[in-house]
Amino acid sequence: LYFAAFSTRKGTKTIPMRISGFTMIKNATKLYYPIRAAIESVLPICDEFVVALGDCDPDDKTYEEIQSIGSDKIRIIDTVWNLEKFPRGTENAHQTDIAKQACTGDWCFYVQADEVVHEKFLPVIKKRCEELLEHKEVDGLLFKYLHFWGDYNHYNDAHTWYTDEIRIVRNDPTIHSWWSAQSFRRIREFDGVSYRHKPGTEKLRVAPVDAYIYHYGFVRPPQYMQSKRKALHTIHWGKGKMESDFRDQTNEFDYGNLSKTKVFKGTHPAVMKDFISRFNWADKLRFDDKGGKNKSNLKHETLKNRIITFIEQNFFGGRQPFAYKNYKVIHPKVRK
């Protein structure tokens, strides 16, 4: 019984719990993704880390960046993206599934290329995995989020941002990435393509873990941010629509009025030190409402969302009681 919380049994052998880390990426260095920091941040508690590496552009150095970590835990799977077969962002989910299916651990820890875990949370995460290992009713773990915005000193907690998301799931072949790889669902009879087809899918039962994912998706030099937005637009809607929608926009993204975001007073993950040292676009940020050509793209600055955000933060303690949740939260009783 003692080992039940820390291991699985096969016959008379006791096998220690294993955690597999996994991610998918393409053109990380070209689009300013902190892929190395993302992997390194969870590597200490992972027994292996699987990367589905897409067919990057010739001027991209993602492979070299991952190899520079120098860990024999890392396993790279070379892939080719097919946006015709997997449109509307589902190639992201498909690539995530490729990496997940190659995992061998009891738990699969998913970090996207712009998501980093602070080292202070690693013991908490590992302990939570250990104590829930034999609670088979738990499909995964639900993490809290900090969405950094514009620079490393501000974060966005507006209604438009999700407060929690699934980032650890059991190594169950019926659990798949969902939609554009933001989350996961159980799909028992999966055709390998229909990542946006809801009928027949099941929300996962997840237990909260007292840990944050630090999301740096909107912390880039403005020109890189615009390039990333174009890449994501292409993945979701095709190159033609991307070119049409961005025709009248500038080459630099406008982060809007940063005085309307929250000031971050904590510390960043140690693995982000090098990436943060490259910060050189302070003169491109603003703290007023003068605006730029791309200001209309900022959903969190619309009157509707500002009102909803005010209500959530002042009457619900920051919770989003009416927001859509792609999971069912459960609270299993665990032995202390």
Feature locations, PLM:
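N-terminal amphipathic/basic-hydrophobic helices that include classical n-h-c signal peptides
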Residues: 1-16
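N-proximal low-complexity "stem/linker" segments adjacent to membrane-targeting elements
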Residues: 15-40
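A structural signal for isolated positions on well-ordered beta-strands in alpha/beta enzyme cores
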Residues: 20-22, 48-50, 75
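Short, acidic, metal-binding catalytic loop of nucleotide-sugar glycosyltransferases
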Residues: 38-49
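Active-site-proximal specificity loops/subdomain of glycosyltransferases
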Residues: 54, 58-105
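Catalytic-site signature of metal-activated, phosphate-bearing donor transferases
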Residues: 89-93, 97, 119-336
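Short aromatic/hydrophobic "clamp" motif used to bind/position activated sugar donors
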Residues: 108
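The conserved acidic donor/metal-binding loop of glycosyltransferases
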Residues: 112-116
